[in-house]
């Protein structure tokens, strides 16, 4: 049985911001579970028995060579992809990189990474990234 297809899956996401206010995005690769070729806030699946923050830390370490601090829950959203027959529940967290420089360690899952100014993001974003971005921009506007 497959997570997100045969039953609802849980996938965590990380919004990471550098000291210039740029957002870290990754382009989904050919082996991604869905929305291949689109840019996203990186993340991954939660394994059975794994806490959300631990899953996010593991995914950032495995896929990008990063150690992160999970700071705050931004959003929990339904990530429903009718064309792909998938449904994920997606908690997304605002995080900070504590060590490492981002690199692509699993090229099948990710083909490109980059830091983007919030006003100059790629237009081809995943569904959940668009939703998370809207909530993040509202959060920083309120906090400013």
Regions of interest found by a model, annotated:
Residues 1-23, 76, 94:
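Conserved N-terminal beta-strand and adjoining loop/helix that marks the start
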Residues 4-8, 35-38, 83-89, 107-110:
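A generic structural micro-feature
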Residues 18, 78-102, 136:
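Active-site-adjacent beta-strand/loop module that shapes the phosphate/pyrophosphate-binding cleft
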Residues 22-62:
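Conserved Nudix-box catalytic region and its N-terminal flanking loop in Nudix hydrolases
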Residues 40, 92-94, 114:
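Conserved beta-strand segments that form the floor/walls of ligand-binding pockets within enzyme
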Residues 67-75:
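A short coil-to-beta-strand element that immediately follows conserved catalytic motifs
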Residues 104-136:
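NUDIX/MutT-family hydrolases
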Residues 141-142:
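Conserved small/polar residues in nucleotide/adenosyl-binding loops
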């Amino acid at each position: 049985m497959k997570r997100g297809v045969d039953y609802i899956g849980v996938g965590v996401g990380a919004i990471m911001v550098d000291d210039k206010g740029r957002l870290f995005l990754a382009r989904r690769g050919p082996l991604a579970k869905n929305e291949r070729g689109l840019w996203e806030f990186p993340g991954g699946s939660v394994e059975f028995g794994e806490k959300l923050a631990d899953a996010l830390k593991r995914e950032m370490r495995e896929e990008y060579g990063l150690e992160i601090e999970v700071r705050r829950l931004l959003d929990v959203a339904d990530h429903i992809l009718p064309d792909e027959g998938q449904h994920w529940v997606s908690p997304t967290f605002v995080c900070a990189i504590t060590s490492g420089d981002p690199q692509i360690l699993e090229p099948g899952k990710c083909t490109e990474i980059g830091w983007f100014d919030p006003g100059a993001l790629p237009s081809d974003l995943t569904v959940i990234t668009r939703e998370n971005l809207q909530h993040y921009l509202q959060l920083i506007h309120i906090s400013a």
